[in-house]
């Protein structure tokens, strides 16, 4: 609850190994020191730290299933902490600053998260809530095992949020927010739910592939540094881009609809099908933009979309082309 307090954490890592001749190396870059021991298959072992890696000796590892337990302090570099809420943002390779992991997008795993938070806080993550448990002045939020995802798509949001629920949509979506204007909430939450449902319907029809994850919820955050982030099952948005004022222009409404369609499209392009490394991040972004345009543009016939595309993209493209060293798309 106090943003200055450290956050004690515990990792239980279950994995299968074929090679036990070499030590196991986990990515970890903490600003709170490093664990010097852990439990491997029930036996306490020393852990060595070298160049942002935890090195677990091969002696207690075995072929097949292994269980590794490490107690540590969660890193602060990707914990965006505010007075009444916090949220993780681990893209591109910052999961290692939060917890020990294999921090690369082509290694996917399932996650079972438990967050112990103040009683008046809500918690959102990429899988459904299994149960809540009272723990003194705090509440434990235990979530179901997630779908297989890359580390950069793991996330949680915790804080003093109001939660709106949509039973009209097929997926019973939830919206976490801190908006205090009751009129704005009443007028806009329905639009947000509808546009997410329309985006899911369109993507399912276009790809002939059902929504690939357990759920689709979202949180709006007034301190979010990006327009949105496509965390699996728990999208994050900058609050001001979704909760528009009554005086919002058609272009602002178009931008909101495209943002929602873009982040929803990432559930297929990026989250289900993922690039091997971030040198190809451009590909998932291009697909998401392409799908957002196809879905949303027809809903705003009064806007000249060709002119809008020209104004938004051509000046920046020409500026790069005129420079001495244009950057390659794949970096």
Regions found by a protein language model. Name each.
Residues 1-214:
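Acidic/His-enriched low-complexity segments
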Residues 143, 176-331:
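Hydrophobic alpha-helical and helix-loop surface patches within well-folded domains
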């Amino acid at each position: 609850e106090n943003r200055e307090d450290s956050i004690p954490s515990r990792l239980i890592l279950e994995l299968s190994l074929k090679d036990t001749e070499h030590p196991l190396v986990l990515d970890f870059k903490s600003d709170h020191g490093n664990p010097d021991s852990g439990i491997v298959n029930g036996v306490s072992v020393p852990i060595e730290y070298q160049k942002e890696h935890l090195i677990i000796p091969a002696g207690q590892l075995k072929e097949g299933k292994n269980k590794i337990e490490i107690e540590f302090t969660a890193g602060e570099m990707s914990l965006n902490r505010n007075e009444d809420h916090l949220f993780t943002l681990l893209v591109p390779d910052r999961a290692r600053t939060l917890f020990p992991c294999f921090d690369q997008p082509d290694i996917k795993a399932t996650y079972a998260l438990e967050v112990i938070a103040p009683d008046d806080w809500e918690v959102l993550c990429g899988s459904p809530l299994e149960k809540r448990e009272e723990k003194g002045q705090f509440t434990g939020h235990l979530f179901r095992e997630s779908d297989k995802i890359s580390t950069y798509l793991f996330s949680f949001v915790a804080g003093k949020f109001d939660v709106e629920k949509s039973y009209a949509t097929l997926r019973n979506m939830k919206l976490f927010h801190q908006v205090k204007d009751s009129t704005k909430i009443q007028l806009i939450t329905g639009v947000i739910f509808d546009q997410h449902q329309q985006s899911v319907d369109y993507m399912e029809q276009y790809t002939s592939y059902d929504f690939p994850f357990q759920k689709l919820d979202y949180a709006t955050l007034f301190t979010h540094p990006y327009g949105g982030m496509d965390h699996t099952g728990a999208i994050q948005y900058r609050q001001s881009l979704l909760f528009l004022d009554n005086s919002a222009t058609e272009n602002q409404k178009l931008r909101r609809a495209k943002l929602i369609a873009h982040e929803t499209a990432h559930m297929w392009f990026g989250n289900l099908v993922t690039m091997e490394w971030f040198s190809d991040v451009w590909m998932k972004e291009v697909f998401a933009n392409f799908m957002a345009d196809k879905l949303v543009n027809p809903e705003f016939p009064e806007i000249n979309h060709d002119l809008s595309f020209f104004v938004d993209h051509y000046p920046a493209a020409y500026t790069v082309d005129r420079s001495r060293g244009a950057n390659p798309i794949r970096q």
